Amino acid sequence: MERITVTLGERSYPITIAAGLFDDPASFMPLKAGDQAMLVTNQTLAPLYLDCVRGVLENHGVHVDQVILPDGEQYKSLTVLDQVFTALLAKPHGRDTTIVALGGGVIGDLAGFAAASYQRGVRFLQVPTTLLSQVDSSVGGKTAVNHPLGKNMIGAFYQPVSVVIDLDCLKSLPARELSSGLAEVIKYGIILDRDFFLWLEENIEAVRELQHDALAYCIRRCCEIKAAVVAADERENSMRALLNLGHTYGHAIEAEMGYGNWLHGEAVAAGMVMAAHTARRLGQFSDSDVERVKSLLVRAGLPVNGPTQMTPESYLPHMMRDKKVLAGELRLVLPTAIGQSEVRGGVAHDMVLASIADCLA
């Protein structure tokens, strides 16, 4: 068992990583006998894990209710969020309840925002079941729903009380979803940890094959990096913005193509290559490093080109709604070397368009 702490003073919390955690009620602390909890999951995961997690909690004396939502990025919306609020109010659940987010990034983001909003804030546990949510979205307190004009535009910073990562969940994850998660894994190596990038170049196939030691190390290292960044910059005023490598381009793909048609990690992968080409055009990232990034993404089963249905010009309106835009100026996360990156403003739109064109299949 691995345990990492996200250090945020009184709001610090543990990330627990191991196989078989769903069988142990201690995994779901601080829930205890007599507590009330609302389990939030989706229609795909409910048959796989709901009875197990609910049973463990109820046998521990926790009073559990549940809400089962439709599955997919297109349902990360205010309309579906209202279903969670309705379930909480119907029972009813008070300010002493705990929301348990059992699912991937969509469930975690949506349930977390519900926790941040319901009666002005109730505690919640993240129980991520996808690689992407285990290495990224469950850690750090970003919660949100989408708007038709932009991804994650309505949300809050709201930290969980615990993150429970059961490695066994990945055995049921479709290969495409696993690859999607690997985009965020590779991102950490590009932006902050050259040694981890080198390790991934040697071990990416072992991770895709779910070999235990490689998988456990991979998830642990990602969580260590994310925890350190969040502890240093919880509200994304500086360093935390680096975690958005590829996302400014990628969110444009998701919004333009329709949420769910491109998985988040697929869009981020193409976006990271676009960012690499932008950095190359600025003279701060070598041709050989661009090729290394592309090669690793391909080996991870990810796209390195944007959708053929989009023109470079179709990206810009979405990119200008990015949360890093300040005073109307586009700001991009760009690599400066493998393991190093920066947030850079003032990049000419013509250069951005040319970099996107570099990645059109």
UniProtKB/Swiss-Prot annotation:
GO terms for cellular component: cytoplasm. The keyword rRNA-binding does not apply. PANTHER family: 3-DEHYDROQUINATE SYNTHASE, 3-DEHYDROQUINATE SYNTHASE, CHLOROPLASTIC. Belongs to the sugar phosphate cyclases superfamily. Dehydroquinate synthase family. It holds the Pfam family DHQ_synthase. Pathway: Metabolic intermediate biosynthesis; chorismate biosynthesis; chorismate from D-erythrose 4-phosphate and phosphoenolpyruvate: step 2/7. It comes from the Bacteria. Coiled coil: none annotated. It is an enzyme of class 4 (lyase). CDD domains: DHQS. This is 3-dehydroquinate synthase. GO terms for molecular function: 3-dehydroquinate synthase activity; metal ion binding; nucleotide binding.
